[in-house]
From Swiss-Prot:
Effect the entry attributes to changing T444I: In strain: SK1
Family: Belongs to the MET18/MMS19 family.
Alphabetized SUPFAM superfamilies for the sequence: ARM repeat
GO-annotated biological processes: DNA repair; iron-sulfur cluster assembly; protein maturation
GO CC annotation, single: cytosol
Outcome of mutating D329G: In strain: SK1
Coiled-coil ranges (or none): none
Protein name stated in the entry: DNA repair/transcription protein MET18/MMS19
Organism listed in the record: Saccharomyces cerevisiae (strain ATCC 204508 / S288c) (Baker's yeast)
Effect annotated for changing A814S: In strain: SK1
Amino acid sequence: MTPDELNSAVVTFMANLNIDDSKANETASTVTDSIVHRSIKLLEVVVALKDYFLSENEVERKKALTCLTTILAKTPKDHLSKNECSVIFQFYQSKLDDQALAKEVLEGFAALAPMKYVSINEIAQLLRLLLDNYQQGQHLASTRLWPFKILRKIFDRFFVNGSSTEQVKRINDLFIETFLHVANGEKDPRNLLLSFALNKSITSSLQNVENFKEDLFDVLFCYFPITFKPPKHDPYKISNQDLKTALRSAITATPLFAEDAYSNLLDKLTASSPVVKNDTLLTLLECVRKFGGSSILENWTLLWNALKFEIMQNSEGNENTLLNPYNKDQQSDDVGQYTNYDACLKIINLMALQLYNFDKVSFEKFFTHVLDELKPNFKYEKDLKQTCQILSAIGSGNVEIFNKVISSTFPLFLINTSEVAKLKLLIMNFSFFVDSYIDLFGRTSKESLGTPVPNNKMAEYKDEIIMILSMALTRSSKAEVTIRTLSVIQFTKMIKMKGFLTPEEVSLIIQYFTEEILTDNNKNIYYACLEGLKTISEIYEDLVFEISLKKLLDLLPDCFEEKIRVNDEENIHIETILKIILDFTTSRHILVKESITFLATKLNRVAKISKSREYCFLLISTIYSLFNNNNQNENVLNEEDALALKNAIEPKLFEIITQESAIVSDNYNLTLLSNVLFFTNLKIPQAAHQEELDRYNELFISEGKIRILDTPNVLAISYAKILSALNKNCQFPQKFTVLFGTVQLLKKHAPRMTETEKLGYLELLLVLSNKFVSEKDVIGLFDWKDLSVINLEVMVWLTKGLIMQNSLESSEIAKKFIDLLSNEEIGSLVSKLFEVFVMDISSLKKFKGISWNNNVKILYKQKFFGDIFQTLVSNYKNTVDMTIKCNYLTALSLVLKHTPSQSVGPFINDLFPLLLQALDMPDPEVRVSALETLKDTTDKHHTLITEHVSTIVPLLLSLSLPHKYNSVSVRLIALQLLEMITTVVPLNYCLSYQDDVLSALIPVLSDKKRIIRKQCVDTRQVYYELGQIPFE
């Protein structure tokens, strides 16, 4: 680089600085490259900037120094010679007198300090300059930042792994003195983070720290407790927690601070603010963790007294929280998440462990003192919860401490008693020692079964513990719900204790839970036992199957009227057993499979018994729910499991539907069982689908004894459900033949078919048109001239299959159906058929991880609604005949009934007048649909409701009265909407209708339905209280 080029570069940098910093930075990099390649020297840059340095213009002097510093910062640390470093150092030193350049000079020193050939003498001189000449109170935060950066760079260069050299010893004390000077009075959060970090580095690495420990501690603790609220749009993203953590880390960096830290923190512990108290406790916790046993030995008495006071005065939790055994499981190990109470316990835990590791004799003295102070609480049953929590916290330290705590504590309270109050206290307090055991030895898991744990004193009390809990659960009165619930919870927690219980003891607990859940009607006992069985099944699934599930399944009789008794208890209902099976087998692999297999076998026997329809329904519902609840969980039902289940239960199910049984003769049971057949095929390996399709076609269509296309057969619904589960890409040569045959069968026999038979064939049309038959072939079967009911139904169901796959032709077909709404003879019928287009079919929906079973698009309802809405609205507005108007409104309302509310939002302004008119339609279903949409509109469009409140309120009042078309649902939703209006419409509007609503609803108080009377009372109460100021 020539001198002219250098001058040009300097001019470019100066011109772009603070305007285009990227360009200025690029120019500085170019100059640095020339220095590195030795085409110019850094001193030449100084010469080139000479005129700017001497300028009377302050801005030019600043820019010139920034230019030099930027180039210097980019220069490699080992490039400048000793002489160059010395000259540059002296140059920056000469600029110190120029107060306007303070920030730029400090930046220059920060760039120079890491240079390899800057001598220790010059570093000492720099530190002395900062100590003597730098007055932090005269500068802004952005300038005060640089001394911290200078100190950090000096520290990183000389003190990291180098504090023993003689050279470094020369600046050790000077460095600390300079830091104390620079850090004094700092308030900027960014600078404080650097200050705290430097303080920690000094106390962790430098020598002679003990000579400065009071000053170093004071320059930290003056900020405690730190409070900082970051400003909006803070560019540094510094949080209050960042500062707290940094300060805490610095305070606990050296045991030299122990004496000052403990005394000052214990003073702060008396603060009334919970936030300050929490910060103090968390800092104390870190002090105990890091300062070690020797500092605790000197301070444990003070710490114990302060912590004991906090714990005894501020107990957290009560009986209700103890009744939830999962609270502790959900706690975080993050220090920042400790409550004040938990932090006190954790400090005591660490104090004990640190003392034990430091000096066992001192620990003995500490523990004896603590136990002597707490023993009276056991005698007088005072503060027992806090007492046991303190002792269990101490016991969580290590095995030896745990054994000492157990052997000293259990004899004081683990005494069997028949007194309810004492037994409750015993069980509640025992819980804390279970937590201590789990903290120390770990939690039981499938992987840890059989892994031994160290010998411990609690094991010696195991038989006594089990006996006490067993008696509390099985011998207590049914009215003693709390005692019995607590015993279930403690048994559940004991299951989690690694290596504590033998399989035989676990089996006994499973037996207790199973018997209690069967014989006790209290919901607390039920859910406690249920959660217990779920917890046990996560670890001991085989035992739960053998002892609990088998017993439950074996209790199911073949005859519905047969009485079921357990332990001579009163008759247990079949519904209760099936509900228990459903509730606790969820997501457990073996339990789900075995339940389905057994229940299918039981169903096969029960179905052959006359008058067993209700029992069959219960069994089929349970099987269906087990499939439906676990179908998408690969850990419970994978492809291999699905195939094994199919092979195990499908022959039994087909035996039921192909012979005379209580299921074939019951339409609802048959439909539900057909849905079970859908699930048995849904997740089997795809490679098996083609073979299964061929087999089912032979059975239902061609060679089997069912042959649903020959004459009407109720099993068409089973065939349709099975087809819904199979891969849409399977080869199905006779698909159109089946489709055509189904259409012909419907047209010929529909008048004589039962409703279930007809729906079975119609759903078969839907499945075929959606996933097997081409769009062209489906449309080819449409006969728009035939306006018979059955032909219209056939076309609607075929169209539904196309709509669900977002067929391009479906929009045009829908418009033809809209045209039929104006037909005086069939318009009313067609309007009701519009619901078919969007109603859900359970076997034709999307399942997670399964994309091959149908062509249903997720957003097909939204698309269909968008296709038909404007046409329906336009036709409605252009029609004079009220009957035809009613058809359009009915069609729209029934589509709205199944359309997601978020899809309706964009159309609400056009839709709202139609909703109000739909409320007068002579059809309860239309009214319900309109009310449901209006309910959603009220929730989301407050202004629109307010504008029309004068119309809405009288309408709703009329709909709340008994009337031919005001069904229970209509009346209930109308009352709910009246109540809802008061929450979204301004008070002054609502007050004008207060009297009208209160008087108009008086007759509704005598409605025949209790649910209507209750809602009416709630609605009237809301209007009665309008404008009143509630009492606090």
